[in-house]
Amino acid sequence: MANADSLDARAFSYAPDASFEVIIITNAPNDHDGYLELNAAARLLAPFQKNISALWTSAAPSHKLVRNNKNYLHVFGLFKYLQNYNFNAKPHPPEYYTVKSVICDLIAGAQGKTFDPLCEIKTQLCAIQESLNEAIVTLNSHATAEPAPGAPCDARELVETLHSEYSQKLTFATDTILDNVKSIKDLVCLNK
């Protein structure tokens, strides 16, 4: 049984809306047992596991921890729910990356990389810039290509289609960034 001084309850944050309660038990230097609160584990594993209700009942007794009337699941208990996930599936759901981070952090006994909202916005801006650059290259290549005689309508339709497609992508990305900026503003206001 772990020493009471070695039990460390904390919260790991991975996104503006993904904060998980964890318990880290330090057995020895560089030897940690990480436990994730059961409801957080259920939310996190929902895209990968259809029967989340069995999460606690099917866990090995050594993977269960009850503290302050809350149930916690050991990091090793999370692995079996990923065994049927197709890692070749693209694109991965956002939870895929969060699960990987949670598992690494629970094994290490500390959160390795905290969520940085500004970094998230920068990443989204870079993705928008790449998308716009692709659109510009495509439009430029079509503009410089000589249209076949009698095909100006086809070229016009192509340009209109490309314009519509990239306008939708830009609108979606802009809305996402605005939502994140609003979340950051809310977080800053809460911290004051």
Curated annotation (Swiss-Prot):
Coiled coil: none annotated. It comes from the Viruses. Its main location: virion. It holds the Pfam family Baculo_p24. Keywords: Capsid protein, Late protein, Virion. It is found in: Virion. InterPro entries: Baculo_p24 (IPR007765). One of its GO terms (cellular component) is viral capsid. Belongs to the baculoviridae p24 family. Expressed late in infection. This is Capsid protein p24. It comes from Orgyia pseudotsugata multicapsid polyhedrosis virus.
